[in-house]
Amino acid sequence: MKKRVIILFLLFIFLLTTGFGCKLVDQKTQDAMKPINLNYWGVWNSQDDFTDILNAYKKLHPYITINYRKLRYDEYEKEIINALAEDRGPDIFSINNTWIKKYQTKITPMPATITMAYPVTKGAIKKEVVPELRTSKSLNLTDIKNNFVDAVYQDVVRQGFDEKNKQNKDSVYGLPLFVDTLAMYYNKDLLNNAGIALPPAFWNSEFQQAVKKTTIQDAQGGLIQSGTALGGSTNIERYSDILSALMMQNGAVMMDESNSVLFNRIPPAIKDQRYNPGLEALRFYTDFANPAKEVYCWNKNLGNSLKLFMQGKLAIFFGFSYHLPTIRAQAPKLNFGIAKFPQIEGNPPINFANYWVETVSNKSKYSSEAWDFIQFAARAEQAKTYLAKVKRPTALRSLINEQIDDQDIGIFAQQALTAKSWYKGADSAAAEQIFAEMIDTTVLAQDKIEDILNLAVGKVQQTVNVNGQ
């Protein structure tokens, strides 16, 4: 009998120390370490961009495999919507910051806590790796406010219905890996030739003089060289963002908390209640496409603003950091610089944010694991590696000072602290088209600018009201 007990004991020790220890782990832990495949869809990143993050995460959670798929922008939204409707969509997917409210019902918000299995080495003599369950707190609302630039909290924190507690509550619906901002690209040679030592910092007479000095017309009044890309619509990169930034800088309220579109109204905070900031911003913008104005430098017959800048025919171009690789690749000899987006002198600085967030589908069977990965990827130590590879401005406050001196992305990163955006409704593309119509109609009929502005606001409001969004 004694001999049998000794044999059984030795057998137990053998099983425990030869890799079969997991058999003795409780069922909950065994379930947590079963192989999991997370499908991740995006637009701008490649598999290589995420290699370092994926490898680092794999070391922590070897049983989780993340499959990244890059789609074309022009097919992305349609594919996402169809895939989610057919229950074949990704666990994690990227969306533009202005799409969050539109996709809110398709997203599982970040949970308060996440329980995950981690490999832990145990044993003094015979080392053995065994799984261990750990429950950790997710980022809370205060963390989002403190860790990320202000625009992030404004965009990713939304009120939704909490099924567990049967009440509305604020939750986090996505996290960004970067925040891009609108900046001023300028052709150094054209400014030098015009006797302009520094790019203008404000939208005042200095900017307008710079535009006049760098605009060249032929004998018939045709534009040979343009001082800046303002005043037009579809042939200007991100025209709606530029005009939105001008309106916000001038004091217009684009939308209130009740989702009412208001950029045609005079806000109560404006001292002169006869001054309409949204209307005057629209007038200022479209003056650059008005042949009767001294600052005339743009019309609908010109080519794309980015292409003209790369061809050396445009002195000042407004764009994001993502335009930089294109300029470098297609115009390697272009002598250009990057400066801050101009402001209204005497007003607090306001910049425009345009970025993407990573979020989790409410159809995912592994929402906790998906959110765990997103939070892991958004941490400073992981973000550093990613940002260095893709050359994008950070969304994290803690990394801004490290990027400020970067000649490529320093300006964009610094501006993130004062960047804002606004929700354009369930169909942001439709809202942008409404802005295009508003701009083009104003150029043709300046005397009807107030009616044009009011009509545009009404149309944008319709995009906001679709499906109760």
Model feature map: region roles:
Residues 32, 157-160, 164-167, 332, ...:
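Long, aromatic- and glycine/proline-rich binding clefts that accommodate carbohydrate-like moieties
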Residues 65, 166, 181, 194, ...:
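Extracytoplasmic/periplasmic substrate-recognition and gating elements
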Residues 70-79, 203-209, 296-310:
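Short helix-initiation/N-cap motifs at beta->coil->alpha
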Residues 113-147, 200, 219, 233, ...:
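Short, solvent-exposed loop/beta-turn-alpha elements that line the ligand-binding surface or hinge
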